[in-house]
Amino acid sequence: ERHLQRFKYSGRWGLQPAHDRLRGEIEAELDAPLPPGVLELDSALEIPAYFASVDIHQHPGGIWSDAIAGYVYERGARSTTPLMQQHKDLHWKFTALVNERRRGSRILDMGCGFGKSTRPFWSENRDAQVTGVDIAAPCLRLAAQDAAAAQARNVRFLQRDCRKTGLPDASHDVVTSTMVIHEMPPPAIRETFAEAMRVLEPGGLMIHLDFIPPEDPFMRFMHFGHGRRNNEPYMEPMVRMDVKKTMRELGFRNVETIDFEEMPGALAARGERWRFPWTVVVGEK
């Protein structure tokens, strides 16, 4: 698994060399003019040491250090779960679940990356104002271009740290993330939850989609092994921390974790294939 991922990105015919040959065209595409207010970058933003110290997913140089990194990362993500492409995308399924619980009017997507998790929110909630924040400028540039190409008028992307977004107190009614908190060490997760509490209005909803394997030795062996092979060093510490206890300590109410069915039959008692242990983490202010 580790070597396959490395070759996928860095091999002779890997994603990085292939896109390096198209660098000029890609950079021109990412530099295309945008409507006012869609993208706000901060060149002075300090990249957290926990994030800069490891090439997450073995992405060469990380997804923040190269102008075309977001473009390459988006292409790489397409091959992560190919068997799921015959079903409704899990991001759209997750958005539907969030909307069932709370159809927000001011939605914050933390760690939005290249915008795949954000798109269903601004697409399905046309009357809402959606904000995506991330520390990786290359990803945000792609997210903004995709939104502009779709003529979206209710979304903006900001280069901010999830732990310190700089957004006003009580300014959102839904705060969400998808596959983000397992990329953070426990202290950063706690800070991110605290920031969500700060920017949520009273009664607001915090809801994250991530991975929490069941209390089964083999399942945890498989999950933690994947994390080690794929340069995801915080996957195991995140699982071992008491996420629900942390949320309650920060003041969240009605805290729960829910198994998430990413495609039909995924939660069957005897599945045919190993799967990521998709879990929804929920709390209210």
Which functions belong to the PLM regions below?
Residues 72, 85-103:
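Conserved alpha-helix/loop element of class I SAM-dependent methyltransferases that forms part
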Residues 113:
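Conserved glycine-rich SAM-binding loop
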Residues 207-267:
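C-terminal alpha-helical "lid/dimerization" subdomain adjacent to the S-adenosyl-L-methionine
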Residues 190-202:
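A short glycine-rich, Lys/Arg-flanked "PGG" loop and its adjoining helix->strand segment in the class I
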Residues 65-66, 77-93:
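Conserved SAM-binding loop and adjacent beta-strand
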Residues 1-64:
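N-terminal auxiliary segments of SAM/dcSAM-dependent transferases
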Residues 108, 116-164:
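Class I SAM-dependent methyltransferase SAM/SAH-binding core
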Residues 163-175:
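A short acidic, Gly/Pro-enriched loop at the edge of an enzyme's catalytic core
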